[in-house]
Amino acid sequence: MSVYVDDAFIPYRRGMLMSHMMADTTEELDKMADSIGLNRRWIQHAGSWKEHYDICKSKRMEAIGKGAIPVTQWVLNEMIRLKRAKHWK
């Protein structure tokens, strides 16, 4: 079981670049969010196969430093696709 962060680097306000953080389980995602100082209210699509956090570049680096696995946005998209397929079985 793992936590993953992508390399989307989507432009946000004031020059921020945002990525996505997701995990194999909600518990792992919450644990990593807590460890890097994210507010749990910031979770996107809680309890669904799309569950993730949007994180800035500095939080992405912090998550990697605490064990998150960096992946490309394409790999993360494939993981989401597989989660969705599993959900609808």
Describe the function of each predicted region.
Residues R13-M16, I43-A46, W88:
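A short, structure-level motif marking secondary-structure boundaries and short turns
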Residues F9, R41-I43, E51, K59:
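Short, flexible coil/linker segments at or flanking structured domains
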Residues S2-M32:
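The feature represents the first ordered module of a protein
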